[in-house]
Structure formats: C-alpha cells, structure tokens
From Swiss-Prot:
This is RTX-I toxin-activating lysine-acyltransferase ApxIC. It comes from the Bacteria. The active site is at residues 24, 93. One of its GO terms (biological process) is toxin metabolic process. GO terms for molecular function: N-acyltransferase activity; protein homodimerization activity. The gene is apxIC. It holds the Pfam family HlyC. Keywords: Acyltransferase, Cytolysis, Cytoplasm, Hemolysis, Transferase. Coiled coil: none annotated. It catalyses: a fatty acyl-[ACP] + L-lysyl-[protein] = N(6)-(fatty acyl)-L-lysyl-[protein] + holo-[ACP] + H(+). Changing residue 19 to E: Does not affect homodimerization. It comes from Actinobacillus pleuropneumoniae.
Length: 172
C-alpha cells in the first residue's frame, strides 16, 4: 500500500529547504506559494530525502508557448492552470542547500531519461539570468539539441511580436 502524499507536509519540507537556501531565503514568501503550491497540486516536483529529512527539491511546469513567454516576461506570473498547459518543461525551482545538487541532477536524469527541461539560471551577485538546457540521460544529444533549437526558434518568432517584453527575474 502506497503512502498518500500530504501536500501540507511537502509544503513544510520545501519551506524548510527554502529557509536553508542562501538564495531562496531572501525571496518573498509569496514566491514560495507561487512556485511550490502548483507543483504539489500537479505532482510536478521531486523531493529528495536522507534519513527522513528533505535535502533537495525541484519543480517544473509543462508550459505551452504562450505561457512560456508569460513566464519569461515575469517569473511570478504563472497560475496553477499554466503549469499543465503544454509540453515545454521548465524547471521552476531547484533547491539543494546542503550540497546535494549532483544527487538531484542524477535523480532527474535517471527518472526522466527522455525528457527535456529548460531553466532560468540567475547569478545571485549580478542578478543576470540566462536560459539553460537539461536533458535526460537516455535521449540522443543531437535530437535534444534539435528540439531545443526548435523551441528557441518558436520562442524568438513569437517574441518579435511582443512590444513590452521585459524578461523580469523578480517582481517589481
């Protein structure tokens, strides 16, 4: 018999990881709700534990192109329905405050062997963001590159029509 997942328990464990992360602890509490609750509701997260204690967490949203643009324009703009709107996977959160990022990375590559993910990576000092690409451990690298190129082409084609696109990393 499998144990039913308690969303409040997961939220508490993720909140503890946020508080333990030098980057996340500086963010407003509203971002915890925006970034974590939809992930729990849609079961689009991984929470790694060691000896019963949380050590790492990541969440992702499966966006359509419209919501991808919305997310890049304002990372705090996604609502619950956006998280399951398409097949363009974005890591929303990646938290490993105790040095377990490699374990989380391996878990994701092993458990999502044919999947593609992208993420906004922010340098905490300069606050400069960039889009990074990740793929599962079994997908052909050339195929992954081709799909990522197609994603970028579609994204850039749509952005040409956006007059007020600002690529915001935090709420103003």
């Amino acid at each position: 018999m499998s144990k039913k997942i308690n969303g409040f328990e997961v939220l508490g464990e993720v909140a503890w990881l946020w508080a333990s992360s030098p980057l996340h602890r500086k963010w407003p509490l509203s971002l915890l709700a925006i970034n974590v609750l939809p992930a729990i509701e849609s079961n689009q997260y991984v929470l790694l534990k060691r000896d019963g204690f949380p050590i790492a967490f990541c969440s992702w949203a499966n966006l359509n192109l419209e919501n991808e643009i919305k997310y890049l324009d304002d990372v705090a703009s996604l609502v619950a329905d956006d998280w399951t709107s398409g097949d363009r996977r974005w890591f929303i959160d990646w938290i490993a405050p105790f040095g377990d990022s490699a374990a989380l990375y391996k878990h994701m590559r092993d458990n999502f062997p044919n999947e593609l993910f992208r993420a906004i990576r922010v340098d905490p000092d300069s606050r400069v963001g960039k889009i990074s690409e990740f793929h599962g451990g079994k997908i052909d690298k050339k195929l992954a590159s081709k799909i990522f190129q197609q994603y970028h082409f579609e994204l850039m084609s749509e952005l040409k029509n956006k007059q007020n696109f600002k690529f915001s990393l935090v709420n103003s």
